[in-house]
Amino acid sequence: GCIATGSVCTLSKGCCTKNCGWNFKCNPPNQ
């Protein structure tokens, strides 16, 4: 399944918007 937007937020990786299998995209952390 896919992780919902805003899930798994960390200071280092930011917020992941998609996580399906090996494909994932993370936005930069908010200042």
From Swiss-Prot:
GO annotation, cellular component aspect: extracellular region
UniProt keywords, alphabetically: Disulfide bond, Hydroxylation, Ion channel impairing toxin, Knottin, Neurotoxin, Secreted, Toxin, Voltage-gated sodium channel impairing toxin
Signal peptide: none
UniProt domain comment: The presence of a 'disulfide through disulfide knot' structurally defines this protein as a knottin.
Family label: Belongs to the nemertide family.
Positions of post-translational 4-hydroxyproline modification: 28-29
Function noted in UniProt: Toxin with similar potency against both insect and mammalian sodium channels (Nav). Delays the inactivation of most Nav channels tested (B.germanica (BgNav1); EC(50)=87.2 nM, human Nav1.1/SCN1A; EC(50)=125.8 nM, rat Nav1.2/SCN2A; EC(50)=97.9 nM, rat Nav1.3/SCN3A; EC(50)=127.7 nM, rat Nav1.4/SCN4A; EC(50)=1150.3 nM, human Nav1.5/SCN5A; EC(50)=149.2 nM, mouse Nav1.6/SCN8A; EC(50)=1361.8 nM, human Nav1.9/SCN9A; EC(50)=1296.7 nM). Inactivation is completely prevented by a concentration of 1 uM, resulting in sustained, non-inactivating current.
Domain of life, source organism: Eukaryota
GO molecular function: sodium channel regulator activity; toxin activity
Note: Negative results: does not show effect on rat Nav1.8/SCN10A.
Tissue expression from the record: Confined to the epidermis and to the mucus layer.
Bridged cysteine pairs (disulfide): 2-16, 9-20, 15-26
Subcellular localization(s) per the UniProt record: Secreted
Name of the protein in its database record: Nemertide alpha-2
